[in-house]
Structures are given as structure tokens and as C-alpha cells.
Amino acid sequence: MRQTKTGILLANLGTPDAPTPEAVKRYLKQFLSDRRVVDTSRLLWWPLLRGVILPLRSPRVAKLYASVWMEGGSPLMVYSRQQQQALAQRLPETPVALGMSYGSPSLESAVDELLAEHVDHIVVLPLYPQFSCSTVGAVWDELARILARKRSIPGISFIRDYADNQDYINALANSVRASFAKHGEPDLLLLSYHGIPQRYADEGDDYPQRCRTTTRELASALGMAPEKVMMTFQSRFGREPWLMPYTDETLKMLGEKGVGYIQVMCPGFAADCLETLEEIAEQNREVFLGAGGKKYEYIPALNATPEHIEMMANLVAAYR
């Protein structure tokens, strides 16, 4: 009996190819055209997206990307490539491909890369620790579209999320401990997750529950009292209500109430990106300090640290 050859597909959101208005516009158009991300009526959404949002937001967002751009590309791309390469070194007999829901490299190119290696089983690991229809669901949809065009379909193992995986929780906890040791223990540890519209949760997306699970498990691993750990949601977009409490409003409130020192971690981001390095590490620092806070530290994402790569290897091992 022929032995199954397994490949691993690491999936993440994506990034513009360059910090320019043109590249950002292409990326945002693809991202914001996905019904998993914005499910507004197309008759209403297309004119707003093409006539208002893309022309106005693209130049502004391009400047933000330029402020965090690295020699090898956007932070998300640099760290994602490092993750892919490190996992491939950790699992030398297993092909590892990287694909993005939006932009390059595409999920389709990643699938084709693995099929060219003659794999007959693919383990798909969306690098979103907490499931949401707008992220993991988008990977699932695109994968289904890709495979619908293939004459032969490999076996697929799809990892829904890993919000309470103990290797993941331990890696987060060790990162927090290292930050506390380096910068001193704060008055409060704030865990900021990417938000989604409240309506999505009301309609069945269990993302907020998965975020609460990670928060509870991490606080337990750290042995921290509940009042010393707070969960918030960032990056809201548009006018409808998103998951609350909002990160920026919470930081402003805490600064005004006299909380002096906060450390912030974003457990939902497997790799640092615009939303962590610019929005959290810079914009929200200014919000907190401007409201009266005294000290603010951002705890980096796990990125391609050895402990994170070992977690990935252990996670996919159960499906190989």
C-alpha cells in the first residue's frame, strides 16, 4: 500500500505588494469585495467601495504601510515567510507552502505548489488562533473554489482554530513573562483581538467565545487575577456596531482613570502586521499616554519564534 504524502498549507490574510496607493488599492479592493468580510448588498456596497472608500483610504493606508515596511516587504509577509521556512526546516520531509486569502502568494498558488510536490493530503492551517467566518471562513471558501476546478482532489485536513491549544497558550504565556521580566510588571495586561461586526456574532459566529477562551486560558497559565487582565477588540470599520469593548476607547478610559502602566498583547495575530505594529504599538500608545497613562509596552506577536514553530509542528502532526 502506497504511503500518503502530506503537505502543509499555512494560510493568512494577505498584504499589499508595496506601500503605494496603487498596490494598496488593489489589495483593499480584493479584501473588501469578499462577502465573508463585508456582506452588505452589492448594489449598495460596490458604488461606496469603488467611488468613496478605495479612492480615499488607499493613499492614507499606503502611508501607514510605509511607516512599518521592512526590507523584505510588509511585516506580515516577512514574518509569514519566516514561519514557512522555519516549519519546513522543522519538518524536512513535509512540503510547506504559504498562501494568502488576498494578494500574493495566493492560496491557489500554494495549492498548486503542493500538488507539484505530488502530495495527496494537505493539512490546512489558517493562522488565526480564534475562528471567525470572516477569516477562517474565507480560507475555506477560497479553498473550495480552487479544488472545484481540479480533476483530482487531495485529501484535506482543515484546522478550524487553536484558541485553547496548550502549546499556543504556553507560548503566549512565556512571551508575556519575558516582557514582564524586561519591562516590569504592569498594572494591567490588555489583550486586544481584531474585531468583527456584532451582527456576525449574533448570527452564529463563535469568534467572541473563542477569544474569551484564549483570554481565560492565558490568564490561568500566568496565574493572574481576573481584574489584572482585560479583553478588548480593535480595528473596527464602518458604522455598524462591532464587538466591544473597543481597544482605543478602553485605553483612553483607563488613562483617564489613573491606570499608569499597561502592556498590550494581540493573541489573535500569529504574525505582526499593520494592525499590531502601527495601530496598537503606535496609535494606541498615543491614545493611552495622551489620556494620562504613564507607560505603555506592546508585546510582539509570536512570529517565527522557535516556540511558535514547535507549536505549529505539534498542531499539524495530529493530521499528518
Curated annotation (Swiss-Prot):
Top-level taxon of origin: Bacteria
KW Iron (keyword) present: yes
Pathway: Porphyrin-containing compound metabolism; protoheme biosynthesis; protoheme from protoporphyrin-IX: step 1/1
GO cellular component: cytoplasm
InterPro entries: Ferrochelatase, Ferrochelatase_AS, Ferrochelatase_C, Ferrochelatase_N
Biological processes annotated in GO: heme biosynthetic process
Record-linked Pfam families: Ferrochelatase
Keyword Cytoplasm on entry: yes
Sequence positions that bind Fe cation: 194, 275
Reaction it catalyzes: heme b + 2 H(+) = protoporphyrin IX + Fe(2+)
PROSITE patterns cross-referenced by the UniProt entry: FERROCHELATASE
EC code: 4.98.1.1
Location of this chain's protein in the cell: Cytoplasm
GO MF annotations, alphabetized: ferrochelatase activity; metal ion binding
Keywords, alphabetical: Cytoplasm, Heme biosynthesis, Iron, Lyase, Metal-binding, Porphyrin biosynthesis
Subunit structure comment from the entry: Monomer.
Function: Catalyzes the ferrous insertion into protoporphyrin IX.
Family, similarity comment: Belongs to the ferrochelatase family.
Record-given protein name: Ferrochelatase
Record gene name: hemH
